A protein has these predicted regions:
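RecA-like helicase/translocase P-loop NTPase motor core
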Residues: 1-178
């Protein structure tokens, strides 16, 4: 059973547990044949999570780019930072690419930032051409949603459930009988 479901009937109330509202945003970038995979970007609520501090983990040494904000959402500033770094990489490699993206509110082109955007001026994209998918078609037209992202979510949930199972097994094993 998944961690967000229960065997209680709808009219019954389940006491002692709340639904976990922990959120992460992960975004991945890959070319059409999968030969060029970029580092995934992970957005979390905490700038330095307790688990990182306890384990003395430096996210800069990870194979991902770690960012944080209050709601763990993709924001225009993070989007522009991502585009700037990708543009620099393409410039260094002497490549020009087409980047297909959805039309999320944070995915404004750098030359037209949203009115409420107050961050640094976005980079000029001279090695990236942005192509936006039409509204409400992401699930059908974006191959990452159907394959890679689905697999990533399934793997994350599997590891999460396994981790919770190990914790519960440990707790039950050490309980004393009355």
């Amino acid at each position: 059973m998944r961690p967000d479901s229960t065997i209680a009937r709808k009219i019954e109330t389940v006491r002692g547990a709340k639904k976990n509202k922990t959120r992460l945003t992960v975004f991945v970038t890959v070319n059409s044949d999968g030969s060029d995979k970029r580092r995934a970007w992970l957005i979390n609520k905490s700038k330095t999570p307790v688990a990182f501090r306890k384990a003395k983990i430096n996210p800069d040494n990870w194979p991902i780019v770690y960012k944080s904000n209050k709601k763990a959402w993709m924001l225009s500033g993070i989007w522009y930072e991502f585009l700037g770094k990708l543009n620099e990489d393409m410039k260094a490699q002497g490549r020009h690419i087409a980047l297909v993206t959805d039309n999320a509110p944070t995915h404004h082109p750098p030359e037209k930032p949203p009115i409420e955007y107050t961050g640094p001026k976005p980079s000029v994209l001279d090695h990236i051409t942005l192509f936006y998918l039409p509204p409400n078609t992401t699930a059908w037209l974006q191959p990452l949603d159907a394959g890679i992202i689905r697999y990533l979510n399934a793997g994350y949930r599997r590891r999460y459930v396994t981790h919770i199972g190990h914790q519960q097994k440990f707790r039950l094993h050490h309980m004393r009988q009355p």
